[in-house]
From Swiss-Prot:
SUPFAM superfamilies: Heme-dependent peroxidases. Belongs to the peroxidase family. Cytochrome c peroxidase subfamily. This is Cytochrome c peroxidase, mitochondrial. The active site is at H116, W255. Residues 1-23 form a transit peptide.
């Protein structure tokens, strides 16, 4: 996961062949609710014009009482064994193609793709997020915050060709699960049912976090994603993986030594390294340590804020606590904005090692 993970027509309808509705949900009137119900029953989705001129998300409008959209996951028609096969192919490619990024491998960038494709969600109108798999479109893939993620997307394309029934939203998020688990991280509960949406449903750029801000920015940014302080600190612990790249984010360096193993090292380094604020070759300020590690200002903000600091210390002292909280928070991030059927199964995948592969 790179630094940019912190800088982080008239109403129309088309028929889906799968049991899915992309629906406008009425918030106060029975009429709007009836429209939504009929749309789902007829296997249609409704959309409204995006005349937004800022980064706060789509404007409500086309349907009188509508304030947001509903992302309905289609009912499961595959079993855990089917998705385990997809998992295994991603994991095998991860294991075999290990020279990427100076032998860091593809794990961290797969986690970053899952994070970024999910992190565009806005709780105010339920737009964005992982549901529609919209990273595959130019508008989202060329968001400056997503620089470098084309490598992860290309890595996953052969998997999509072998398993064409999986949606891009499911593929991108499952790739992140593989990245965490195969790099010795915790189990990540995962549910399928995302459905690819058309290009005009791509969220606006500017929804991903910046890396050069303070604790107030971090807290306010994550409010849009509906995360509390503990979940924020847990999610940022994914920076144990990978490194920053000047050409992608404007920052340079690894967060620690074990950058392809998922541990609580991020918190230990925050507390124990001799950090100095310095300007890098791009002219951006970052915290550097004598060991060659770096922290973004938004990383360092976690020890400048008293509430965040308590949690950093807890995770530094107890990796199991970090793993438990990260698993819950990351699974929640991947599902933000999606309504799953009550009986939708939760898949828990075995690693290649656990399968003896």
């Amino acid at each position: 996961m790179s630094a940019t993970a912190l800088r982080i027509a008239p109403i129309a309808s088309r028929t889906f062949q799968r049991r899915l509705g992309y629906l406008l949900a009425g918030v106060a009137t029975g009429a709007a609710a009836t429209v939504a119900y009929k749309a789902q029953k007829n296997n249609n989705y409704y959309k409204y014009n995006n005349n937004n001129n800022n980064n706060s998300g789509f404007k409500a409008g086309a349907l009188a009482a509508a304030a947001g959209v509903v992302h309905l996951a289609h009912e499961e028609d595959k079993k855990t064994a089917d998705y385990q096969k997809v998992y295994n192919l991603i994991a095998e490619r991860l294991r075999d193609d290990d020279e990427y990024d100076n032998y860091i491998g593809y794990g961290p960038v797969l986690v970053r793709l899952a994070w970024h494709s999910s992190g565009t969600w806005d709780k105010n109108d339920n737009t964005g997020g992982s549901y529609g798999g919209t990273y595959r479109y130019k508008k989202e893939s060329q968001d400056p915050s997503n620089a470098g993620l084309e490598n992860a997307a290309k890595f996953l394309e052969p998997v999509k060709k072998q398993f064409p029934w999986i949606s891009y939203g499911d593929l991108y998020t499952l790739g992140g699960v593989v990245g965490i688990q195969e790099l010795q991280g915790p189990k990540i509960p995962w549910r399928s049912g995302r459905t690819d949406l058309p290009e005009d449903m791509t969220p606006d750029n500017g929804r991903l976090p910046d890396g050069d801000k303070d604790a107030n920015y971090v807290r306010n940014f994550y409010k849009r994603l509906d995360f509390n302080d503990r979940e924020v600190v847990a999610l940022l612990g994914a920076h144990a993986l990978g490194k920053t790249h000047l050409k992608n984010s404007g920052f340079e360096g690894p967060w620690g030594a074990a950058n392809n193993i998922f541990t609580n090292e991020f918190y230990l380094n925050l507390l124990n390294e001799d950090w100095k604020l310095e300007k890098n070759d791009a002219g951006n300020l970052q915290y550097n340590s004598p060991k060659g590690y770096m922290m973004l200002p938004t990383d360092y903000a976690l020890i400048q804020d008293s509430n965040y600091l308590k949690i950093v210390k807890e995770y530094a002292a107890d990796q199991d606590a970090f793993f438990r909280d990260f698993s819950k928070a990351f699974a929640a991030l991947l599902e933000r904005g999606i309504d799953f059927p009550k009986n939708q199964p939760v898949h828990i995948f075995k690693t290649l090692d656990e399968q003896g592969l």
